[in-house]
Amino acid sequence: MKTLLKNARELKGLKTREVAQLLGIDQALISKFESGTRKPTREQVVKLASLLEIDLETIMVVWLKEKILYEIGEDEFALKALLVAEEEIRYQSKPSKKKLSTTLQKILDEIDTLKTKLDGFRQFDSYRIAQALELEYTFESNRIEGNTMTLRETDLVINEGLTISGKSMREHLEVINHQEAIAYIKDLMQRNSSINEREVLSIHNLILRGIHPEDAGRYRKVQVMIQGSSHMPPQPFLVAKEMENFFIWYETNKSILHPIVLAAEIHERLVTIHPFIDGNGRTSRLVMNLILLQHGYIIANIKGDYDSRMQYYQALETAQTKNNKEDFLLFIAQMEKESLERYLNIIGQ
């Protein structure tokens, strides 16, 4: 653990003092972590992994190994105890692949057929097509949140740098910021970056840049309510812990779930925590689409018209208040299917 932390810190070019400031803990603790005289807590391990860009699974395995050795390493019955515990751990904690409904499995199969077809035409991918679809995504995602820019106005702001008369500065910034956030997740996809706290906060920072600079890229410090929803997000003092669990859940399930289900689950879990004062919906949709892009799918564009918006909100509400995610998983799967069909139609296939 100590070598892993020190090497990662030095690779990032950070001093122990800088790491301590970024994590909000005492510098002496960082030195003790690196010397091996003190072990970080689970929460500190998650934060260190995010800050120093260490694979969460790798560092958690090292942390747990050292924790086990500290507790029972010198006991004469340690090895026997571990052998007995191994089977229990396998039984209790091995993530199981959740059985999907027949309806959901059918649409996932249809999506994968469409993706396979699209994969055969990847060499014909057009920058102009991608640019047009990303523009539509920015338009629709902002429209969901109440932005009144039309698709044409969104285009003029992004590609012509124009100011639209009668539209607020916030609406202009929402358009510009979202388009830059799309570029950012595409860069993360190209670099095969892991989804961690740092990247989620960076996406959110882009979304609120110039709109709420004091809240951009930071977890909320106040309680919030979701207008029109009976779901009550967690209290602000619980947000950091909920987000820690969020990232652990992702690491545990990222290799188990179908990518569409994983992306939809991450979307729902993040927006349910509602970790930010504003920009939760856009950030959640961007993180969802980052996962889809990483697995070779295309952006799932949720429409912002009234009917689509109500279907989206109702599916979310059911997931949040009744712990029934079927409607939401089906909704996201349908959005991805429609996006794939449209893309294939555009390229004439």
Task: Name each model-derived stretch.
Residues L5, V19-A20, I30-F33, I59:
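Conserved hydrophobic/aromatic packing and binding residues within compact polymer-binding modules
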Residues E10, E66-D75, L79, E86-Q349:
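FIC/Doc superfamily catalytic core
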Residues G24-K39:
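Recognition helix of helix-turn-helix/homeodomain-like DNA-binding domains
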